[in-house]
């Protein structure tokens, strides 16, 4: 789509992995001008099906995300914690209100670190 950032990740092997995905915007404002004001993150499988959506990371999975040590620094930022089977995935970052700006998608394999 237009005005979105798309990041891809591949889970290889024969066993699933747990990932933490962060969608940042406001916390980048100290060093970058024109950041996304209210990032929303969507996780899709290889068929394009939505697996998870998050707008404000504290709205869902707050305790689990905090326990990883990877909680976004700003309450308006997004995060998803998801167990994924081997395959291809995309994370789509946009602004919940349609604004444009600079954002960052981070994907961490946290299997075994929970």
Write out the residue ranges for each language-model feature.
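A sequence-level detector for low-complexity, Ser/Thr- and acidic-rich stretches
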Residues: 1-114
